[in-house]
């Protein structure tokens, strides 16, 4: 796919819808609280503008909009079936403060929707081509207000290496299967078969068992788009931050595991990481290595 192309060609999410969910870590109240801990003055959640890129069927955004009728919420997704369902749900809930648009992120500018206090992109960044990732970061740079907060989730190394083993096994085993749900079921069945084999080394079996236990918690549709996706690119934390800084974005904090929560580590580990880290970004990277996150 070339940089002058958009994402509209053969979009798999119009074939199999991605199951949306409520994401507590993206709620503007939570994001504002984290920002205040670090000395920022974010817009109050009850009077703000929120943009969600890749909003899916709108479950997360409709939930937020329902709680804050004086705030404005905008959801963008490329899949038409997602937007249709999001609009239907918003109408059934009687929401007047949320809007959903079928839109390619490559076509969005400041003139399209204006500026925002909070921008969310969950389950998007690692599953799009490089030029789209660049566009997403540029939107955060261009569309966030001065005290605006951006939330981006992505698959992270080194932990993603363990997941990659299972993903590659599933992809190889199902390489000739075209039907999405059949592909997922065959892939799951193959991994389950491997977890039952005692011939493989114990470490391999333990890793595969752990990943399989996590895998089967999710709907088949989510597994299809996450584990069997053509594009699924993890990043080291420092790699992502370097790309973000090219777009004038600054790391503030993890949304769930705050960098200040060092109680998980023994004192000697904390001291060692502080001695070899020049900043919080490097400290976070060392922590990821230690936890294989």
Q: What spans do the regions from the language model cover?
A:
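Conserved alpha-helix/loop element of class I SAM-dependent methyltransferases that forms part
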Residues: 15, 19-48, 63
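Conserved SAM-binding loop of SAM-dependent methyltransferases across substrates and taxa
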Residues: 57-70
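Conserved SAM/SAH-binding beta-strand->alpha-helix loop
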Residues: 79-81
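Conserved SAM-binding strand-loop segment of SAM-dependent methyltransferases
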Residues: 94-106
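A short acidic, Gly/Pro-enriched loop at the edge of an enzyme's catalytic core
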Residues: 110-119
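A short glycine-rich, Lys/Arg-flanked "PGG" loop and its adjoining helix->strand segment in the class I
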Residues: 134-146
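Conserved class I S-adenosyl-L-methionine
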Residues: 149-182, 186, 190-200
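Rossmann-like AdoMet/SAM-dependent catalytic core
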Residues: 202-293
């Amino acid at each position: 796919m070339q940089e002058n192309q958009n994402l509209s060609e053969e979009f798999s999410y119009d074939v199999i819808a991605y199951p949306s969910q409520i994401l507590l870590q993206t709620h503007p109240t939570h994001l504002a609280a984290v920002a205040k801990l670090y000395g920022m003055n974010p817009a109050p959640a009850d009077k703000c503008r929120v943009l969600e890129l890749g909003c899916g069927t709108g479950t997360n955004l409709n939930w937020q909009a329902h709680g804050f009728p004086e705030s404005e919420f905008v959801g963008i997704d490329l899949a038409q079936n997602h937007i249709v369902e999001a609009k239907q749900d918003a109408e059934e809930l009687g929401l007047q403060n949320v809007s959903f648009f079928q839109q390619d992120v490559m076509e969005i500018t400041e003139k399209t929707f204006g500026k925002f206090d909070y921008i969310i992109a969950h389950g998007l960044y690692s599953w799009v081509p490089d030029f789209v990732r660049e566009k997403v970061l540029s939107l955060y740079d261009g569309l966030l207000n001065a005290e605006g907060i951006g939330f981006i989730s992505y698959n992270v190394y080194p932990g993603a290496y363990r997941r990659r083993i299972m993903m590659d096994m599933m992809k190889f085993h199902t390489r000739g299967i075209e039907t999405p749900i059949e592909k997922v079921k065959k892939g799951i069945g193959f991994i389950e078969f491997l977890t039952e084999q005692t011939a493989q080394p114990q470490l391999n079996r333990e890793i595969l068992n752990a990943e399989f236990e996590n895998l089967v918690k999710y709907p088949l549709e989510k597994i299809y788009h996450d584990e069997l996706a053509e594009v699924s690119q993890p990043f080291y934390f420092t790699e992502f931050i370097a790309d973000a800084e090219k777009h004038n974005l600054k790391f503030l904090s993890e949304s769930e595991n705050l960098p200040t929560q060092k109680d998980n580590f023994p004192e000697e580990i904390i001291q060692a990481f502080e001695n070899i880290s020049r900043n919080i970004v490097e400290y976070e990277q060392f922590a990821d290595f230690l936890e294989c996150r």
